[in-house]
Structure formats: C-alpha cells, structure tokens
From Swiss-Prot:
InterPro entries tied to this protein: At3g26010-like_b-prop, F-box-like_dom_sf, F-box_dom, SCF_F-box_component
Pfam families: b-prop_At3g26010-like (PF24750), F-box (PF00646)
Species of provenance: Arabidopsis thaliana (Mouse-ear cress)
SUPFAM superfamilies for the chain: F-box domain (SSF81383)
Top-level taxonomy: Eukaryota, Viridiplantae, Streptophyta, Embryophyta, Tracheophyta
Record-annotated F-box domain positions: 1-43
Name used for this protein in its record: Putative F-box protein At3g28280
Top-level taxon of the source organism: Eukaryota
Length: 311
C-alpha cells in the first residue's frame, strides 16, 4: 500500500474505526505523519459526522443514561459515554462519589465539568475532566470572591482539534443569570461579568458547550421556554455576548419536553408537534420536525431557527 498516492491512502484509512487506523502509525513514519495530520482529522470528521449524532448532549443531569452512544466503534470507544463518565466519577471520588455530579458537557473536545450536588455554594469544588482519557484538573478556588454560585457550563476554544483554552462559567445564585463568575485557563484567574438577561431556571438537561458558546434552555417570567446562548469567545470584545431565542414551535404544545442535541457541528432541536393545514380543515398529528441553530455573519450565535420535516 506504500505505492498508493497519499490522498487515496487517506481515503481508505479514514473509513476505518479510530482504534484500527491509529495502530497503522507504527507501520512507517509516512503513515504516522498522515494519520496525525490536520488534513486527515478533518477528512475523518467530514465523512463520519453526517451519519453519527453526538451523545454527549443527550445525557441529562440524572444518573440514568438517556441514549447509548451510536457508533462507539467508529469513534474508538469500547463502551457508552455514560459508562466512561460513571466509572470516572467512582474512581475519582470513591466513597464521596454521590456528592458530585456532572454539570455540563463540552461536545467539542469531550470534556465535562464536575462539582458538588448542591445548587448554590459559596466556595464549591470544580473539576474539568476527560472521562475517556481519565485526565482531570481541579479549578482554583473562587472563595475570595465571596459569591454564592451555581455551575453553568464550560466553553472551549480549539484549533485543528487541539484544545487551546477553556472557560468555566458559574452564575451568582442570588442574581440568577445577571452576574457570571468566569474562570479562564489562559490567565488562571476568576473574573466577574454582568449580562443583561432576565430568564430563570434550567430544564432537566445540562447546558451544552459548542464552538466556544454555552447553550441551555431557560424559562421567561411568563413560563415560556427559550434558548439562551453565551458566547465566551466573541471576537473584538472582552464581554460575554448573550442571545435569547424563542423556539420555532412557540405557542404549540410539543409532545416531548424540549431539549437540545448536536449534529454535524450545529445545535439541533427536534420535537413532535401538531400542525393545522392552511385551510384549517385537517390537523396532522405527530408531524416530526427538527431545526438547526446556524451561524450568522460568521459568528456562532443563535439566529431564528428554520424548520425542516424529517423524512
């Protein structure tokens, strides 16, 4: 196979599971260089992301696994993501395992944010970990800020699949989401950031980190579900960019509790709703619809969603 052109060889190897083509790195330095190249990584993602949904965001806050990881073999995982997370927590905290939980998942690099079960604590313990590789970092104390806090999420910045830095975000328990406590791995410091946001509460799903932003579902003062996005790496500004978006099925009664997932590098919302024809003569029950939240002007924000029927 050494006589094959490198681009053709890459197309052959990229269709194999990760655990198989990574073993080919020992064949020769040429293969090792190719498998480790940004081109090969981007090619692998472009081929497989269209047929595999990420399960990181499907895992809710509860201990029960909502969905198994589809395509674990392709992505080099021997067990489901829930297994890796649960076993990591048990190994890390041992007898104190039930005192800690995962508050947020980063779909970009597979990192999780761990803290105590208690919702509001003045000086909570915080850990950023990769449950598959078993790597774990304890975040420096924020007790000197003397603020009651609750974990919101973790945002990451990557380049060619390499983690450059991350930010851990807490919100002030007494201020709801108006005042954020943000830790930057780049500076190793905590800072306080104020945002103009009047929503409250989480749904039963952990916030999702994607492309440097944290997304979650909150409620307005009128008990309406909205999608909230904090862009922690907004270009040209040191402040957090915030956007609140009404769901595209607003005013309707979806069959399932609203929740997010990720697909092909975008945030996705899917539900089943009832639709009435234009003439009002017939109501179609259980029409399945899904929406993607896409980029606007090159920025990772939450614009108006566009519905597309599922075939």
């Amino acid at each position: 196979m050494n006589s094959l052109p490198e681009d053709l060889l890459a197309m052959i190897l990229v269709k194999l599971p990760i655990k198989i083509f990574t073993t080919f790195k020992i064949v020769c330095t040429q293969w090792e260089s190719m498998v480790d190249s940004p081109y090969f990584r981007d090619l692998f993602l472009s081929i497989h992301q269209n047929s595999h949904y990420s399960s990181w965001s499907i895992l809710s806050r509860c201990d029960e696994e909502v969905i198994a990881h589809y395509g674990c073999n392709t992505w080099g995982l021997q067990r489901s993501l829930h297994f890796y997370i649960s076993s990591f927590l048990t190994k890390k905290f041992e007898t104190q395992r039930n005192n800690y939980k995962v508050w947020s998942y980063s779909t970009d690099v597979g990192m999780i944010l761990i803290s105590e079960n208690c919702i509001c604590v003045k000086n909570r313990s915080l850990y950023v970990a990769n449950p598959v590789s078993q790597e774990c970092v304890e975040i420096p104390s924020h007790g000197y800020l003397k603020k009651v806090s609750c974990p919101l999420g973790i945002a990451t910045r990557t380049e060619n699949g390499v983690l450059l830095d991350y930010k851990v975000v807490l919100f002030n328990g007494s201020d709801t989401f108006r005042r954020l406590l943000i830790y930057s791995s780049q500076t190793g410091m905590w800072s306080i950031n104020t945002v103009d946001l009047t929503v409250s509460g989480f749904h039963n799903q952990s916030p999702i980190s994607l492309h440097g932003s944290i997304h979650w579902i909150a409620s307005t003062s009128h008990s309406e579900d909205v999608a909230v996005s904090f862009d922690l790496y907004a270009t040209g500004t040191s402040s957090v960019q915030c956007r609140v978006t009404t769901f595209p099925d607003f005013g309707k009664h979806p069959k399932f509790t609203r929740s997010f997932s990720t697909c092909q590098g975008s945030l996705m919302y899917m539900n089943i709703i009832s639709i009435t024809k234009v003439d009002g003569s017939l109501e179609i029950i259980s029409a399945r619809l899904y929406w993607f939240l896409k980029e606007k002007n090159g920025r990772k924000v939450l614009p108006q969603c566009q519905p597309t029927p599922l075939s």
